[in-house]
From Swiss-Prot:
Domain spans labelled CoA carboxyltransferase C-terminal: 260-506
One GO cellular component term noted in the UniProt record for this chain: methylcrotonoyl-CoA carboxylase complex
PROSITE patterns (UniProt xref): COA_CT_CTER (PS50989), COA_CT_NTER (PS50980)
Cross-referenced Pfam families: Carboxyl_trans
Gene name, Swiss-Prot/TrEMBL: yngE
Keyword entries, A-Z: ATP-binding, Ligase, Nucleotide-binding
Disulfide bridge map: none
Region named Carboxyltransferase: 2-506
Family membership: Belongs to the AccD/PCCB family.
Protein's organism: Bacillus subtilis (strain 168)
A Gene Ontology molecular function term of the record: ligase activity
Name of protein: Uncharacterized carboxylase YngE
InterPro entries, per database record: AcCoA_carboxyl_beta, ClpP/crotonase-like_dom_sf, COA_CT_C, COA_CT_N, MCCB/AccD1-like
Length: 511
């Protein structure tokens, strides 16, 4: 008799583990999509360790696990919780038990104080079940409420494999990082069909909410992956930089030498302040080999943000990119920096600012886009950060650009300069024109060039980096080829830095 019960249990479990009908599996395979349990096998070190509510809706037809797997496993030896939509079950849509399962795995992650990963592939809420799914105290809104409450306490990561529609689009929005699979992933509040019906706009799914659009234009996506396998490996790598929660320190890895280059750093940085160069060239020479994990590479590329290691110590890098738009800060790049700085500060990852910046962009277009507000957001995030902050002036740091890149007034733990550095309100050319425009206009044409050249040299002397070192505005002038060792020593020294908190609830952020 007992064997009959065991047989029933086994048969039910096998049906549930298979997910939806074969035709939906076939459709996913044609799109290059993996089955939800295949995704989890790749994500975890050794497959699922624990799975709750496996039998949710097992008495209903066609709703195995109610379309979502909630599980506990390990990544890099670290315990993590996972919510994973099964798109073979009603397109991964949410029913009442789906929502309850997601809420419960969030509550478990909170109790275990461990990272929570969302594998999203869902058509949204089931309209036919909206009373049980949508408005209640433990309805879908509770998922987003929980995400906000967990933010900064545990890492929250989104792997977006398919759609994340309507209100469900806020799951990725509230995560620390969103990895999207090109060609399949999408997120939008209203579908193209709805947009055409309501506002008369005809638009493709990719234009409305595709992975490439969100990773390059809206900034809602952080990393664009070519395949699901690549996306999963990226998330495993990302987690290696982070502690399990905000109460722990970021993990120290074994020290590795930097990548070998024939050309030393001193020969890579142009002495001409206006000559473009790729800041990646500097970064790769000061970090441990192959440790740069760039975030939002396609969005606002005039600023680089990413995680790296120096002598095994995780560090968050915020660097101007002179190769793109001269490294000028725009509203999008300021927004990009603010989010990244906040992320690193939440999980005790020191910040390294590499400044080569002519300032913030000017003009009516950026003013109307709110560059002052977004710039304030970046400066606010940088000022609020209590982790070790190292500022390096690579070449120019002009105007408010100096402030945004953790200049001396913002209490970085050190402000270092390379011999190529300049700090000023503006560059020599602009300064001479601003101060002497009337005088230049009055001079005979044959005398203007010599006058401008003379005043430019005077200005350069005024902003000489050794003068700033003499005045103790900067802490040290470092040979470029010694920068890595200098940063490693300072990171080690600053790791005992005391965290200070002010007696207020929170600032009024310029968001």
């Amino acid at each position: 008799m007992l064997m009959d019960y065991e047989k029933e249990r086994t048969e039910r479990a096998e049906r549930i583990r298979k997910g939806g009908a074969e035709k939906y599996h076939q459709s996913n395979r044609e799109k290059g999509k993996l089955f939800v349990r295949e995704r989890l096998s790749l994500l975890f070190d050794d497959d699922i360790e624990l799975e709750d509510a496996f039998f949710a809706e097992c008495m209903s037809d066609g709703l195995p696990a109610d379309g979502v797997v909630t599980a506990i496993g390990k990544i890099g030896g670290q315990t993590v919780c996972v919510m994973a939509n099964d798109s073979t079950v009603k397109a991964g849509s949410w029913g009442a038990k789906t929502v309850e399962k997601i809420i419960r795995i969030q509550e478990i992650a909170e109790k275990l104080n461990c990272p929570l990963i969302y594998l999203v592939d869902s058509a949204g809420a089931r309209i036919t079940d909206q009373i049980n799914v949508f408005p209640g105290r433990r309805g879908a809104g509770r998922i987003f409420y929980n995400q906000v409450k967990l933010s900064g306490r545990i890492p929250q990561i989104c792997l977006l494999f398919g759609p994340s529609a309507a209100g469900g689009a806020y799951i990725p929005a509230f995560c620390d990082i969103v990895v999207m699979v090109d060609g399949n992933a999408s997120m939008y509040l209203g579908s193209p069909r709805m947009a055409e019906m309501v506002i008369g706009e005809k638009v493709s799914l990719e234009e409305m909410g595709g992975a490439r659009m969100h990773c390059s234009i809206s900034g809602c996506g952080d990393i664009l992956a070519e395949t699901e396998e690549e996306a999963i490996q990226l998330v495993r790598a990302y987690l290696s930089y982070f502690p399990a929660n905000f109460q722990e320190k970021a993990p120290i890895h074994e020290k590795r030498p930097p990548k070998h280059f024939e050309t030393p750093l001193a020969d890579v940085i142009p002495q001409n302040q206006n000559a473009p160069f790729d800041m990646h060239e500097l970064i790769e020479r000061v970090i441990d080999e192959d440790s740069f994990f760039e975030i939002k590479a396609l969005f606002a590329p005039e600023l680089l943000t990413g995680l790296a290691r120096i002598h095994g110590q995780p560090v968050g890098i915020v660097a101007n990119q002179p190769k793109v738009k001269g490294g000028v800060l725009f509203h999008d790049s300021a927004d990009k920096a603010a989010k990244f700085i906040t992320l690193c500060d939440a999980f005790h990852i020191p910040l390294l600012f590499l400044a080569d910046i002519p300032g913030f962009m000017i003009g009516t277009k950026v003013e109307q886009a709110g560059i002052i507000r977004h710039g304030a957001k970046m400066i606010s995030a940088m000022s609020e950060a209590t982790v070790p902050k190292l500022s390096v002036i690579v070449r120019k740091a002009y105007g408010a650009g100096l402030y945004a890149m953790a200049g001396p007034a913002f209490e970085p733990d050190c402000c270092l300069a390379l011999p190529t550095a300049q700090i000023a309100v503006m560059g020599p050319e602009a300064a001479v024109n601003a101060v002497y425009a009337k005088k230049i206009a009055e001079l005979p044409e044959e005398e203007r060039a010599a006058f401008i050249s003379s005043k430019r040299e005077e200005y350069k002397e005024d902003i000489n980096i050794y003068r700033l070192a003499s005045e103790m505005i900067i802490d040290a002038v470092i040979p470029a080829n010694s920068l890595r060792d200098e940063l490693a020593k300072r990171l080690k020294a600053y790791m005992t830095k005391e965290m200070t908190f002010t007696n207020r609830k929170h600032p009024v952020y310029p968001v």
